[in-house]
UniProtKB/Swiss-Prot annotation:
This is Elongation factor 4. Required for accurate and efficient protein synthesis under certain stress conditions. May act as a fidelity factor of the translation reaction, by catalyzing a one-codon backward translocation of tRNAs on improperly translocated ribosomes. Back-translocation proceeds from a post-translocation (POST) complex to a pre-translocation (PRE) complex, thus giving elongation factor G a second chance to translocate the tRNAs correctly. Binds to ribosomes in a GTP-dependent manner. The keyword Membrane applies. It comes from Staphylococcus epidermidis (strain ATCC 35984 / DSM 28319 / BCRC 17069 / CCUG 31568 / BM 3577 / RP62A). It catalyses: GTP + H2O = GDP + phosphate + H(+). The keyword Protein biosynthesis applies. The gene is lepA. It is a peripheral membrane protein.
């Protein structure tokens, strides 16, 4: 392809992604766009075509971003190349969204005609505006009985400042308005600006591992050209590789001769190590490198930590491999080895939030066949000790003794909730109960209120979202972002079984709630831990002080069953022998702890 052809081609490229709150019909709209541009044979068409993971289909959510190239013949007679980058909508996957947006010039903003704008919609809009993207607003599901497209159009104007005339009314399910959206993409989304003659700059926005071909990186070319045979250099690490294949996704992988300015495609360069192709890095040519790397998107730091332990200790190394492979296209997943007296060897793993944690666990169990026990999640606490040193604690078992600590700081988040009017009281009460501090409240219209609170992250990560949904009959939407660490009066609660501390059940709690939580947890454990041959005391302790206790009764084994009638002294002898046996067992006995018991720490608030 000569210089002029590359410039002409660039003018007809449109790169866009679809952003929306969960369940506003994003994946269905992506399906319709694929269908209407004849990108997929009718026989291959299926719902949620871009959601390739089984888990995504089952839960009906998008977890991984996906990029696909489409051809569209517009009414002006030109043929355009569209690159559609599908993104997730859940608050835990914001970083996936920010990655996709870094590769685009425009975004289709999908809003449900019945639900209207939700917290996550706003969060994604601000992300798109930070990336200077053009927005194409679409009100979807207009054929629903509860749809109120006019109210939603008004809302878009009032809350985001979008002109009502620019809004497209559509129903992805019934194929209404799709043609208009495709034409709007041509008009509204700008062509990429970049110089095909300049040194190569390509942004890696995703990567996956193929056991045969090595790392396959999804890239967006900002400047320059790349083709098979080129020697490329990663700007973050300085490592060099030879390109063996470049290609595009249609959604299947299709090798092409070259990728040039504005193209979104994939590159394979015999990269064997996951760390050498980090998402957010810039690729350039080894012999003619670019001066400085592209602005990657912001690195997301894990917020929630938990221990993952294989049920069978032989799987320890397999678990490490599984985590490394998942980490390849999940830059925010972090892990380090950890050992626990109760659970053996495993990994302390960091996640963005609870959904992220569940999904990683489920993927390890499904894709790698490793059965796991997960400990209760915790957040990072900063402790200033009396000797002036500072320690970060992400595992309650490692918390220093209280008498050595001068101050403890915990992370606080700004939680934004959009709630129907009738439930404001219930939501405020929930936030108060979770140690929240009221910041402000805006009425969007007669029906909905935007409430902002500052809440400790440790209260949010457990089951805040579930409780928010049940307190508002499912109508609330929720988004949160980290603000700062603040000092709190926190204590470490230890759980003792049969007098021994179980490190995996320790948790950190605010002193005001310590007694209730300790009491609730020992009662809960009493029902979850199977009865043993001997009585097991379950205690909750802060330091040396026991704050709650209960006993798990022993199973009675009838040692007299073989004793028919007969001598009382014989029976007494058998009972004495049983008693001595139980005492010995109690001294050396191990208490079996089921997985549910480790998760009981989470569910204490439900009682």
């Amino acid at each position: 392809m000569d210089k002029q052809e590359r410039y002409n081609r660039r003018e007809n490229i449109r790169n866009f992604s679809i952003i929306a709150h969960i369940d506003h019909g994003k994946s269905t709209l992506a399906d319709r766009i694929l269908e209407n541009t004849k990108s997929v044979e009718t026989r291959e068409m299926q719902d949620q075509l871009l959601d390739s993971m089984d888990l995504e289909r089952e839960r009906g959510i998008t977890i991984k971003l996906n990029a696909v190239r489409l051809k569209y013949e517009a009414k002006d007679g030109e043929t355009y190349t569209f690159h559609l980058i599908d993104t997730p909508g859940h608050v835990d996957f914001t970083y996936e969204v920010s990655r996709s947006l870094a590769a685009c010039e425009g975004a289709i903003l999908v809003v449900d005609a019945a639900q209207g704008i939700e917290a996550q919609t706003l969060a994604n809009v601000y992300l798109a505006l930070d990336n200077d993207l053009e927005l194409l607003p679409v009100v979807n599901k207009i054929d629903l009985p509860a749809a109120e497209p006019d109210r939603v159009k008004q809302e878009l104007e009032d809350v985001i400042g979008i002109d009502q005339e620019d809004v497209v009314l559509a129903s992805a399910k019934s194929n209404i308005g799709i043609e208009e959206i495709l034409e709007k993409i041509v008009d509204v989304v700008p062509a990429p600006d970049g110089d095909p003659e300049a040194p190569l700059k390509a942004l890696i926005f995703d990567s996956e591992y193929d056991p045969y071909r090595g790392v396959i990186s999804s890239i967006r070319i900002i400047d320059g050209v790349v083709k098979a045979g080129d020697r490329i250099k990663m700007m973050a690490t300085g490592k060099e590789f030879e390109v063996t294949e470049v290609g595009i996704n249609t959604p299947k992988q299709l090798p092409v001769e070259e990728l040039t300015v504005g193209d979104v495609g994939y590159i394979i360069a015999s990269i064997k190590n996951v760390d050498d192709s980090r998402v957010g890095d810039t690729i350039t040519l080894a012999e003619r490198p670019a001066d400085k790397p592209l602005q990657g998107y912001k690195k997301m730091n894990p917020m929630v930590f938990c221990g993952l332990f294989p049920i069978d200790n032989k799987d320890y190394n397999d678990l490490r491999e599984a985590l490394e492979k998942l980490q390849l296209n999940d830059a925010s997943l972090e892990f380090e080895p950890e050992s626990s007296q109760a659970l053996g060897f495993g990994y302390r793993t960091g996640f963005l939030g609870m959904l992220h944690m569940e999904i990683i666990q489920e993927r390890i169990e499904r894709e790698f066949g490793i059965e796991l026990i997960a400990t209760a999640p915790s957040v990072i606490y900063q402790c200033i000790l009396k000797d002036g040193s500072e320690v970060s604690v992400d595992n309650p078992a490692q918390m220093p003794e209280r008498d050595k600590i001068e101050h403890i700081y915990e992370p606080f988040v700004k939680a934004t909730m959009m709630v129907p009017n009738d439930y404001v009281g219930a939501v405020m009460e929930l936030c108060q109960r979770k140690r929240g501090q009221f910041i402000n409240m805006d009425y969007l219209d007669d029906i909905r209120v935007n409430i902002v609170y500052e809440i400790p992250l440790s209260e949010v990560v457990f089951d805040f979202f579930d409780q928010l949904k049940s307190n508002t009959k499912g109508y609330a939407s929720f988004d949160y972002e980290f603000i700062e660490n603040k000092e709190s009066n926190l204590v470490k609660m230890d759980i003792l079984l049969n007098g021994d501390k179980v490190d995996a059940l320790s948790f950190i709690v605010h002193r005001d709630f310590a007694y209730e939580r300790g009491k609730a947890l020992v009662e809960k454990l009493k029902t979850l831990i199977p009865r043993q041959q001997f009585e097991v005391p379950v205690q909750a302790a802060i330091g040396q002080k026991i704050v709650a206790r209960t006993n798990i009764k022993s199973m009675g084994k009838n040692v007299l069953s073989k004793c028919y009638g007969g001598d009382i002294s014989r029976k007494r002898k058998l009972l004495e022998k049983q008693k001595a046996g139980k005492a010995k067992m109690k001294a050396v006995g191990n208490v079996e702890i089921p997985q549910d018991a480790f998760l009981a720490v989470l569910k204490m608030d439900d009682e």
